[in-house]
């Protein structure tokens, strides 16, 4: 919601160009909170399937999360500027995509191995969220309406949370 509310308001009023700082701050906050969300999903997986050990996976999860957060903190992201470089949007999302892929694979494999009907679609919710998110990262600055894909992305995350609370 940190970026959806300003985006929706801007699109319904005077336009995105008048809300650059609010959108940028919202994107920054969301970048950090979504990284934490994926760490939490990793622990949902560990708890759900009673995983012990797997130190290498835990290190990979924390390494990708730390790298993502560090990259988000660089001033080159120019979060509050209209001309924020696409390159930094890509850089900071590479470790995030790897983190997401790790979580996707873990849930997909474990749900199949355990014949877990309740969590059988968890992996798909994450795939969908990235499917809606990647075009926004790549094209929302040149085709602002693409930013509306954040709405179905958010719906995918709601589905993720609903599965988690079953």
Q: Can you annotate each of these PLM segments?
A:
Residues 2-5, 29, 33-36, 60-70, ...:
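Lipid-exposed faces of alpha-helical membrane segments in multi-pass integral membrane proteins
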Residues 2-21, 25-59, 70-77, 104-107, ...:
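Internal transmembrane alpha-helix with an interfacial aromatic "cap," most often the third helix
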Residues 47-52, 113, 128-131:
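Secondary-structure boundary elements
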Residues 58-64, 82-100, 116-123, 150:
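A loop-to-helix transmembrane entry motif
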Residues 52-56, 117-118, 144-145:
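Membrane-helix interface segments
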Residues 2-13, 65-84, 127-146:
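C-terminal ends of transmembrane alpha-helices
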Residues 16-27, 81-94, 143-153:
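Non-cytosolic membrane-interface motifs at loop->transmembrane helix junctions
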Residues 40-44, 70-77, 94-120, 132-139, ...:
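Alpha-helical transmembrane segments in multipass membrane proteins, preferentially the mid-helix core
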């Amino acid at each position: 919601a940190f970026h959806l509310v300003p985006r929706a308001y801007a699109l319904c009023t005077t336009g995105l160009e008048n809300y650059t700082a609010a959108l940028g701050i919202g994107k920054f906050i969301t970048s950090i909170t979504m990284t934490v969300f994926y760490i939490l999903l990793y622990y949902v997986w560990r708890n759900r399937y009673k995983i012990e050990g797997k130190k290498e996976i835990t290190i990979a999860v924390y390494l990708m999360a730390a790298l993502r957060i560090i990259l988000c903190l660089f001033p080159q992201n120019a979060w509050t500027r209209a001309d924020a470089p696409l390159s930094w949007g890509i850089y900071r999302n590479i470790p995030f995509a790897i983190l997401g892929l790790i979580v996707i694979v873990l849930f997909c494999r474990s749900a199949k191995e355990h014949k877990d009907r309740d969590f059988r679609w968890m992996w798909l919710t994450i795939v969908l969220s990235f499917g809606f998110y990647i075009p926004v990262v790549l094209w929302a600055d040149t085709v602002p309406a693409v930013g509306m894909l954040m709405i179905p992305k958010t719906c995918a995350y709601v589905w993720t949370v609903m599965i988690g609370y079953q």
